[in-house]
Regions:
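Terminal, low-structured helical/coil segments at or just beyond the last alpha-helical repeat
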Residues: 1-17, 247-291
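Alpha-helical segment of the N-proximal tetratricopeptide repeat
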Residues: 19-60, 64-71, 92-94, 98-107, ...
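Structural marker of alpha-solenoid helical repeat scaffolds
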Residues: 21, 54-55, 88-89, 122, ...
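Helix-start (N-cap) detector for alpha-helical repeat units in TPR-like alpha-solenoids
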Residues: 26, 59-60, 93-94, 109, ...
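Canonical tetratricopeptide repeat
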Residues: 64, 98, 132, 166, ...
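TPR/TPR-like alpha-solenoid repeats
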Residues: 68, 102, 136, 170, ...
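Alpha-helical adaptor scaffolds
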Residues: 97, 101, 135, 165, ...
Length: 291
């Protein structure tokens, strides 16, 4: 209609013109915001998204805004945006898990549990929700409840490898090495090889007193990823306990190279005497479960 009016010289509708202009501005702001996010200009992206939302409500733009906030470390703001989206789409489990993930990053486990409870009201048999609920329980050091939630998640989805890994890590922390070994065995057989699974396996073997096997697994991790600080650190502890002072010192030197802040109290060059003393000190303070 506006086209024909302009073509034949008729009157235009100011409201329609404003609506069309707002729509164009919204699209431009959304496009500029997405483009800015892709090149890491998150502050500008936030300005674009917030301005676009002043024009009209849009779930996609609000989701983009939450992601930009996360990139900037503004987790409170990100969570607020995601919670607004969950109100708009109360049955959207994925959005609730996004919000729970941000709460987890904030270490706000009460908020995380509240979100998971809302998600379970929508789908009580969602394995991923039970996994997130377990993470919140474990964050509060409720190990028994966390194990129960993880077991529930695995019962609902036996292929949920993240739940088995977390359960294995928690069982190790609780000293139940045999049960932890069962989770590692399943992961080794059914899941793709990963550093986390191998590290868990090595830690279990070390806790059982199988130092040689643990060292072998740590060495395999290092072969896969020569920058795996935990593997060097924990292998070095075992080498020290076995009397392999040279091997332990070599591992500690690698730890210091890869993570200079690890031993911020080391002064001067790494003399033979100094590195030995610091190595013994570091390994004596090391948690045997890598926790």
């Amino acid at each position: 209609m506006g086209f024909w009016n302009s073509l034949f010289g008729g009157e235009t509708n100011p409201e329609e013109e404003k609506r069309a202009a707002d729509e164009r501005n919204f699209d431009l702001l959304k496009y500029d915001g997405v483009k800015a996010m892709r090149i890491g200009q998150y502050e500008y992206a936030v300005k674009c998204f917030e301005k676009a939302l002043e024009t009209k409500e849009d779930a996609e733009v609000r989701d983009y805004l939450s992601r930009a906030f996360i990139r900037m470390g503004r987790l409170d703001d990100a969570l607020a945006e995601l919670k607004m989206l969950t109100v708009q789409e109360p049955d959207n489990i994925h959005l609730k898990m996004q919000a729970a993930g941000v709460a987890y990053m904030k270490e706000d486990y009460e908020e995380m549990i509240a979100i998971c409870e809302q998600a379970l009201d929508v789908d009580a048999d969602n394995a991923m929700v039970h996994l997130f609920y377990a993470k919140a329980e474990l964050g509060q050091e409720n190990l028994i409840q966390g194990i129960a939630r993880l077991t529930k998640a695995i019962a609902l989805d036996e292929n949920l490898a993240d739940a088995r890994l977390l359960r294995g890590q928690t069982l190790l922390k609780m000293g139940d090495f045999n049960a932890a070994t069962e989770d590692v065995a399943w992961l080794t057989e059914h899941a793709e090889e990963s550093e986390d699974v191998l590290l868990l396996h090595a830690r279990i073997e070390a806790a059982k007193g199988n130092a040689d096997e643990a060292i072998r697994i740590y060495s395999h991790v290092i072969d896969i990823n020569p920058f795996q600080v935990d593997a060097f650190r924990e292998r070095g502890k075992l080498r020290m306990e076995q009397g392999d002072k040279q091997g332990a010192e070599e591992d500690m030197k690698m730890v210091l190279e890869l993570n200079p802040e690890e031993m911020a109290d080391v002064n001067g060059e790494y003399s033979a005497e100094g590195i030995e003393q610091k190595t013994r000190q570091a390994y004596s303070n090391l948690n045997p479960f890598g926790i």
